[in-house]
Amino acid sequence: MAGENVRDLSLCISGLVPESKLVSFDVAISSNQIGDTDLKRAIDPTWLHSQQNDDRLIIHALPINYSIDGNSGIKDPRGMHCGKLGVNMHVITTSIRAVKNITACVNRCHLDVDSQILGSYAAGLACLVEDEKELGVVCLDIGGGTTDIAVFYDGELVYTDAIPLGGTHVTNDIARGLSTTLSFAERMKT
């Protein structure tokens, strides 16, 4: 690893800027049998961009499950026959201005942003095992000023949010409650 130059990086987005919502979309299947091209057409983010505000950037469009002719809950519909393929997606957007500002800062360091990932999603992928995500789990990423939340169920990320309370707030509460210094409260917290 020593002597390597980093040129590209993935931008981790967290805090109160990202928004999470569930969307559904249907596409007609002309061949009656669902193939890879039909799945790509169903999860194509092009139609999502037409639904978004100009000030939002889609960072994740994650299929949760599919439906065929109105029958939902299907994980992998390839090879099945239907006239209409539906997809339920978890779409996560963020402020395009915030991403542009952070990207400009990164570019000034002679680096390029290769991709963006939601911080709580990345934390869940790094910390959780498949069984936990399958059974259902909440991953909390407690930062200094915010707590990021990622909910996994049936192996998929189904909800994300952030609340404006973090570790700094806990430290301040300990310091006030015990009438002590912030540094001592920080040591007590850990």
Predicted regions and their residues:
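A short acidic Gly-Thr/Ser loop motif
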Residues: 14, 139-146, 152-155, 164-168
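Generic structural marker for isolated residues within well-ordered, non-membrane alpha-helices
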Residues: 171
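Nucleotide/phosphate-binding catalytic cleft detector across ATP-hydrolyzing
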Residues: 1-139, 156-158, 181-190
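Residue-level detector of high-confidence beta-strand sites
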Residues: 160-162
